[in-house]
Amino acid sequence: MPSVADKSSVAELAQRAAAILLDRKANDVVLLSLEGVSDMTDYFLIASGTSDTHVRSLGSSVMEDMKKQTGQVAHHVEGLSQGRWVLLDYVDFVVHVFHPTLRNFYQIERLWADAKVVPITVGASR
């Protein structure tokens, strides 16, 4: 895992995960910088799948491709078998993949309204 002091590497890893989600047709992909807002992590990456199967597939793809491309392994994983809300904790960034109904219900972007939206770099996974 990159050190907390290595902010550019963390940003690059979060961008790479975003590109993986976009490559797998995730919807409404948003990257939030939590710098100055929270001490628990640097970034939240939020996306939606179109169905339980798509949500599971997106979560699995991020885990597999991040390990293959960067050697990064999620420290903690939740919700993968259900496919409603998958959480992948990479310590310095956290990936949330939602079924659309749950994303609408929890409105996680509103909970973190003070966080800065970071533009996603197209092609970060290449």
Regions found by a protein language model. Give the residues of each.
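A short, glycine/Asx- and small/polar-enriched loop/turn
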Residues: 38-42, 89-91
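Mid-chain, well-packed structural core segment of small domains
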Residues: 65-96
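Short hydrophobic/aromatic beta-strand micro-patches
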Residues: 46-48
